[in-house]
């Protein structure tokens, strides 16, 4: 999103910055890893395609992306939002956190009669039944940085930014959702710790869906 192009979320030892051109090469090298491709349900891209993707993400109004940096010399602190991109080394990158905005109809909406005589009433009903879901994705790329509690802090800081910046209100987000492989117990625990509840199991993809309703 354009809204976070000049933003840093500073948590001391963890720093969130917008995905920039300087990050692409390291990100591309990460995504050559077959395990990460499987965990993120991603297909490998060429380097040129990765640069095109970064440029697209920076202006996409339905996708919010931050690169996560690790600064082991600083202590953890509550997230603060800065109106500039903090100077940093690309070598400090450890992952990313994203949110996609999607429209969703309430259960049963497809059952309405769409005959011409009922068109106006149906359209009005459908409009009122559509809500926005913020679907989150978290990746910590390298194993040595996993299971250290970073993921919980990253998602917490990300949601703090989405709420306090006004994005959640302006985009009329009703709830947050995450999809996690059913065997990825650490990630499931992470999101449950942050208040997410499991709402669905998808047997075809073998993943669970967890959701968190917004409170304001």
Curated annotation (Swiss-Prot):
GO terms for cellular component: cytosol; nucleus. Keywords: Acyltransferase, Cytoplasm, Nucleus, Transferase. Coiled coil: none annotated. SUPFAM superfamilies: Acyl-CoA N-acyltransferases (Nat) (SSF55729). Residues 68-215 form the N-acetyltransferase domain. It is found in: Cytoplasm; Nucleus. GO terms for molecular function: N-acetyltransferase activity. Gene3D superfamilies: 3.40.630.30. The keyword Transferase applies. Its EC number is 2.3.1.-. Pfam families: Acetyltransf_3. Belongs to the acetyltransferase family. GNAT subfamily. This is N-acetyltransferase 9-like protein. The lineage of its organism: Eukaryota, Fungi, Dikarya, Ascomycota, Taphrinomycotina.
């Amino acid at each position: 999103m354009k809204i976070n192009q000049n933003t840093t979320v500073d948590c001391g030892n963890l720093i969130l910055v917008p995905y920039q051109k300087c990050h692409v090469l390291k990100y591309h090298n990460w995504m050559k890893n077959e395990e990460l491709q499987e965990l993120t349900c991603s297909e490998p891209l060429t380097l040129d395609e990765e640069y095109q993707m970064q440029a697209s993400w920076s202006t996409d109004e339905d996708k919010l992306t931050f690169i996560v940096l690790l600064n082991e010399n600083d202590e953890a602190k509550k997230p603060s939002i800065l109106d500039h991109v903090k100077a940093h080394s690309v070598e400090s990158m450890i992952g990313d956190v994203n949110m996609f905005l999607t429209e969703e109809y309430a259960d049963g909406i497809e059952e309405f009669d769409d005959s011409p005589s009922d068109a106006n009433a149906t359209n009005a009903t459908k409009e009122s039944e559509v809500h926005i879901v913020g679907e989150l994705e978290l990746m910590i790329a390298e194993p040595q940085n996993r299971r250290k509690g970073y993921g919980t802090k990253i998602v917490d800081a990300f949601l703090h930014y989405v709420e306090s910046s006004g994005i959640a209100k302006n985009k009329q987000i009703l709830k947050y959702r995450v999809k996690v492989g059913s065997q990825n117990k650490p990630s499931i625990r992470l999101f449950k710790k942050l208040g997410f509840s499991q709402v669905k199991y998808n047997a075809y993809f073998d993943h669970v869906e967890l959701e968190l309703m917004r409170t304001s």
